[in-house]
Amino acid sequence: MLAVVGALSGCGTTTTAQPSPTGPGVLTLDKATAPEPGGEVGEASTEFQNATDMSMWTKLSETEKDVDRIGKFDINKTVKGSLYLEPRTSTWFDGFRGPYVYQELAGDVLMYARVKVEGMKGGQPKRKFSLGGLMARQPGSYAKPNWVSVTTGTADQSGQVEVKYTQDGSSKPQELAVKTGWVDLALGRVGRVFVALYREDGGKWKVGRRWPSNLPDVLQWGITAYTDWDSYNLLKKDATKANAKQVKGVPDLKMTVDFVRFLRPELPEYADALNTASVSDEVLIKAMTPAGA
């Protein structure tokens, strides 16, 4: 089991120290570079053109002997050229565990995907907290979960992106309004910061959240989808009991993933990505989204 190094503080906030706008602590747009494709992380990328790509992804339920909460999962079958996933009634919140397929990668990583989340009969999911997207998780953190995610679908309302950091089993989510349809999601770690970004179809990239990162070097990077928080009823207060069985409910989510691409982001040592005066949203977007994307 890998342990968290240090402790998270000020989760979801930026630092208050303000460097001079022209001082050495400011990363300007012309000095920022887009993430690099290729290498070890590049080999983890896939466009989902072949069913054999399934072998690249590992189910969390298999590695950590959990309940398999995935109803349907295939590549280049239900939707040609795409990964397709239907979760059973499930959730990722605090100590609750849901579906997750992943690859283990080390170091600074940017994971970029194009996803579409719908209800089972089309349109937006009707059950609360029916969301799908990207997650990075500390392996083996069953008793005290540590993970970060960016997902889209229906949270407390339909048409939302949710950005969420969970430290030692305590989740801090934030919802942001988004248009329905295809959404580009990006989740990355660079240095001491995690970043979640999103882009509506035909729109511009936006920074969803920045968080301090003190998680281990090796993380699980992958895809999650969950649905139907309504059906947890009394189990909403008991993650241990909920995790021990498949909760019966009315799942209402199907997710299509067009591609998942992995890149290596990089920031100069003087840049403090937790400080918007050091690294503005505009600069962070350039540093944490693929060139030309």
Question: Where in the sequence are the language-model features?
Answer:
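Sec-dependent N-terminal signal peptides
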Residues: M1-V4
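C-terminal motif of bacterial Sec signal peptides marking the signal peptidase cleavage site
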Residues: A7-G10
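Extracellular glycan-recognition regions
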Residues: T15, S20-A293
